[in-house]
């Protein structure tokens, strides 16, 4: 897909990856960009910068997503690309609030389902359309310190795979974005924390912290090639391959790696463990 002339909706667009994508799509000649986020003030600022429309939206509300899609289709005649990008990170295990898991499931998984349910009928009728869902490298690997994030991001990857397999013959293309860490204010604060939060932040930054512009460049290239996996940190492909080759070895290595992280003995950049049995990554607060 080439971005020029396209009608695009981006959720989670007030900052980070979403804002970076909006700005890049504008530079590449998108016809119309709708930027949606809970932060109404910031999302309208982004929309103003890209000459688009800013909308206050809760992605866990299916009625609201359907209404937005219907409005854009009525005004623009079509939606070419829906970027389901909203997300956040928290670090909790089994002892954590189960309500927090429910909320994260709503944002990281059900929001993608709601978007697909709303936008696919029109795309299928036209015989073309593109879904870009933001997950995380944690969806391919794991996130030490966060059960909630690990589980929901893995589910997001699985959903994207299902959508691509099920609807490709109807002209629908699907990509899933799986970055490690991307520079945001929230990520900066994570480094000042302790325990699982700090460990998770160190882990995510193992292969470098990218700017939102660098992530947007990787996305545009992947969309142009209609590539399913979008990996701004290319190292993740090798990590996932090693995990698939010998999962038991990977799990053993990850346990040792986790111990080192919590002990504070793993400096930034020293992430391959157990003779190349990998680390993982998490991403961005989208």
Task: Give the label of every model feature segment.
Residues 2-33:
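Canonical Rossmann dinucleotide-binding motif of NAD(H)/NADP(H)-dependent dehydrogenases/reductases
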Residues 28, 141, 162-173:
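Active-site-adjacent segment of SDR/Rossmann-fold oxidoreductases
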Residues 40-41, 57-67, 98:
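The beta1-alpha1 cofactor-binding region of Rossmann-like NAD(H)/NADP(H)-dependent oxidoreductases
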Residues 66, 88-102, 125, 145-148:
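Conserved mid-core segment of classical short-chain dehydrogenase/reductases
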Residues 116, 152:
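Active-site helix of classical SDR
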Residues 136:
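Residue(s) in the substrate-gating loop at a strand-loop-helix junction
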Residues 169-235:
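SDR active-site lid
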């Amino acid at each position: 897909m080439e971005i020029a002339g396209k009608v695009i909706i981006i959720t989670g667009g007030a900052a980070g990856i979403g804002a970076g994508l909006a700005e890049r799509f504008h530079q590449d000649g998108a016809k119309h960009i709708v930027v949606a986020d809970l932060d109404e003030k910031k999302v309208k600022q982004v929309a103003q910068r890209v000459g688009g429309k800013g909308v206050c939206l809760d992605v866990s509300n299916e009625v609201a997503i359907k209404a937005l899609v219907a409005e854009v289709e009525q005004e623009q005649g079509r939606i070419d690309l829906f970027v389901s990008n909203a997300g956040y990170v928290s670090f909790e295990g089994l002892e954590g609030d189960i309500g927090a898991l429910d909320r994260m499931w709503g944002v990281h998984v059900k929001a993608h389902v709601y978007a697909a349910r709303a936008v696919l009928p029109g795309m299928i009728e036209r015989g073309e359309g593109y879904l870009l869902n933001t997950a995380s490298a944690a969806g391919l690997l794991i996130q030490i310190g966060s059960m909630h994030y690990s589980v929901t991001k893995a589910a997001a990857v699985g959903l994207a795979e299902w959508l691509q397999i099920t609807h490709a013959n109807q002209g629908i293309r699907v990509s899933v974005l799986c970055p490690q860490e991307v520079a945001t204010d929230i990520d900066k604060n994570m480094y000042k924390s302790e325990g699982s939060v700090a460990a998770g932040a160190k882990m995510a930054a193992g292969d470098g912290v990218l700017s939102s512009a660098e992530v947007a460049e990787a996305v545009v290239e992947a969309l142009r090639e209609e590539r399913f996996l979008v990996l701004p940190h290319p190292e993740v492909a090798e990590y996932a391959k090693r995990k698939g080759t010998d999962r038991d070895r990977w799990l053993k290595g990850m346990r040792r790696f986790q111990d080192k992280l919590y002990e504070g003995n793993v400096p930034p950049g020293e992430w391959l463990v157990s003779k190349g049995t990998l680390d993982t990554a998490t991403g961005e607060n989208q």
